[in-house]
Amino acid sequence: MALNYERIMAHRPADIPVSYGERECIIYALGIGLGMNPVDPGELKFVYERAGLQAFPTMAVVLGWPGRMTDPAFGVDDRLVVAGDIKVVLHRPLAVEGKLLSRPRIKEVIDKGPGNAAIIQNTRDLIAEDGTVVATVDSSTFARKHGGFGGKVTDTPVPAAVPQTAPGQICDLPTPPNLALLYRLNGDENPLHADPARAKV
């Protein structure tokens, strides 16, 4: 299957209305491993509505997620697609409930060469009802074995340098074996998270 660069870049995803509340905040927090210590006030505030509930900041990742690239015209084999890096910029804190408009866009597709991946770079703004941008989510998707389509090869982002100082804070969260199954409840229905046979592809 050959990746169709022109078709992907010409695609204009529709805006996605988002409505969420306390339940979604709690499910997201449980899906990233919070609540493993059910008596820790630092975790309870994300998983219990009577503990001063807060939305975990990275919840912006799943709000208004545009889904996978399943249109056959894109020439992308969905079985070979995995999530890459994600950057979240919060312009203001996420409320524990609200209505937003997700505005996704495809920024670029980078060619890593024949036999390698194509990196699909996306961005989306989460826009409040008053028109202000609440968060911007930049992400990369790796389409394994889709390189060699003749696209750009030099625009790979440079990773941030590792700080040479001691960390300001350390967070150690265990990840239970069923965490991917819980995370799917946020709307990411990629079979990779639940189907062992699919994960072997």
For each feature predicted by the language model, list its residue ranges.
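A broadly conserved detector of short glycine/acidic/proline-rich loop/turn motifs that flank catalytic sites
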Residues: 24, 31-32, 174-177, 186
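HotDog/MaoC-like acyl-thioester-processing domains
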Residues: 1-14, 64, 81-174
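Hydrophobic, proline/glycine-rich low-complexity stretches
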Residues: 1-99
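Solvent-exposed, non-transmembrane amphipathic alpha-helical segments
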Residues: 28, 45-49, 124-126, 154, ...
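A conserved, well-ordered hydrophobic junction motif at loop->secondary-structure transitions
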Residues: 41-58, 169-171, 178-201
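Short, functional N-terminal and low-complexity linear motifs
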Residues: 69-71, 147-151, 183-190
